[in-house]
């Protein structure tokens, strides 16, 4: 994880505007960062959500087009499902733009304990069990990651003591 903080005044390129992308965008905007959002094939729903959030949803037609748009970017955040061979990564590498993940951002913004569970099979089951065990023991926990709740959203709940995160390999590979 990089130690540089994304905060007010930072310009961030976010690639992928699904559930996690929208949550990361909201978290960045809340922290007064400028966000450039990209998606290869946005739906009408995504376009409407982006408009409501006050961000432009860009469709990069080429590596060259993307490089022009990211010339003033401080950081880049790919969403978990973006393939490693996508030209987004090569553009960021060429421009020497640090790539952060949702987990990196969450760790920068929140210091509460995170129990991250990974593996080939059984992640959801184990996460659910750990979450229930924590609740039964009186600890307020949140279930996040590959679930319906991105970690950047879960950290917004101040009552939560511990984050239980389902972290599959595509989330940890960056």
Regions found by a protein language model. Give the residues of each.
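Phosphate-binding loop of NTP-binding sites
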Residues: 67-71, 80-174
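N-terminal leader/targeting and accessory segments in enzymes
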Residues: 1-101, 105
């Amino acid at each position: 994880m990089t130690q540089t903080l994304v905060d007010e005044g930072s310009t961030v390129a976010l690639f992928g505007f699904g559930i996690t992308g929208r949550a990361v965008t909201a978290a960045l905007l809340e922290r007064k960062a400028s966000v450039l959002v990209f998606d290869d094939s946005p739906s009408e729903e995504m376009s409407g959500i982006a408009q409501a959030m006050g961000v432009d949803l860009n469709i990069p037609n080429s590596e060259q087009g993307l490089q022009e748009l990211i010339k003033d970017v401080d950081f880049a955040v790919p969403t978990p499902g973006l393939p490693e061979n996508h030209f987004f990564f090569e553009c960021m590498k060429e421009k020497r733009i640090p790539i952060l993940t949702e987990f990196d951002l969450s760790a920068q913004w929140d210091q509460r304990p995170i129990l991250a569970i990974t593996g080939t099979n059984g992640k959801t089951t184990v996460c659910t069990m750990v979450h229930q065990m924590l609740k039964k023991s009186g600890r307020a926990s949140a279930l996040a990651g590959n679930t319906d709740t991105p970690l950047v959203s879960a950290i917004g709940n101040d009552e939560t003591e511990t984050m239980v995160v389902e972290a599959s390999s595509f989330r940890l590979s960056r």
